[in-house]
Design a protein with these regions (language model features):
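Membrane-water interface at transmembrane helix exits
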Residues: 19, 23, 27, 46, ...
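Alpha-helical transmembrane signal-anchor/signal-peptide segments
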Residues: 52-73
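Hydrophobic membrane-insertion alpha-helices, especially the h-region
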Residues: 14, 34-49
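Extracytosolic and intramembrane catalytic regions of membrane-associated proteins
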Residues: 83-165
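Membrane-embedded alpha-helical segments of integral membrane proteins
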Residues: 1-26
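Beta-strand-rich, non-transmembrane domain signature
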Residues: 70-82, 89
Length: 165
């Protein structure tokens, strides 16, 4: 986060410097108020670029065995450009290298990692029933059965786990 702040500040100085160089090249024909406008536009462009690059940068840095199962794109009124190209701001990764089979065929315990922009990574264990296309949080250890959700074989998490075995 700190490095992104530094990058935005550097972009602002570069934008202002570019406008100052244009003013010098045109003999002062451009108005002086364009200098802070150039700085602001450069800072905005750096911020937007960083926001859009987060998903690809983070997903490419995942360790071997972690596969992206699903991503969520969003729009916001305070980011009007997201209505043109939605911004991916969170995703779920499955640790396919560490799937644990159950005694019952087709049942697997998987570790899921939830990544979000400006949020800490959360991990959850989930049971996946590949033949039935359903998933459940594991039982709490109190002897109760897990609550299964029928999500179908096309569910991104079920598909990623079942293809990973």
């Amino acid at each position: 986060m700190f490095l992104e702040l530094i990058a935005v500040a550097v972009a602002g100085f570069a934008g202002a410097g570019g406008i100052m160089a244009l003013r010098l090249a045109t003999g002062g024909a451009l108005p002086r108020w364009l200098i802070p406008v150039g700085a602001g536009l450069a800072m905005l462009a750096a911020t937007i670029s960083s926001e859009y690059a987060w998903f690809s940068r983070t997903s490419q840095a995942l360790p071997e065995g972690l596969e992206v199962a699903s991503s969520v794109s969003s729009t916001a009124f305070y980011r009007p450009w997201t209505y043109v190209v939605p911004l991916t701001d969170r995703f779920v990764a499955v640790d396919t290298g560490n799937l644990r089979p159950n005694e019952q065929d087709g049942l697997y315990m998987a570790d899921l990692y939830f990544f979000g922009r400006w949020r800490p990574v959360r991990s959850v264990q989930m049971m996946i029933d590949c033949p039935a296309g359903r998933r459940a949080d594991p039982a709490l250890g109190d002897g109760s059965d897990p609550v299964w959700r029928d999500v179908g074989p096309d569910d991104p998490i079920v598909r990623t786990v079942c293809e990973g075995v």
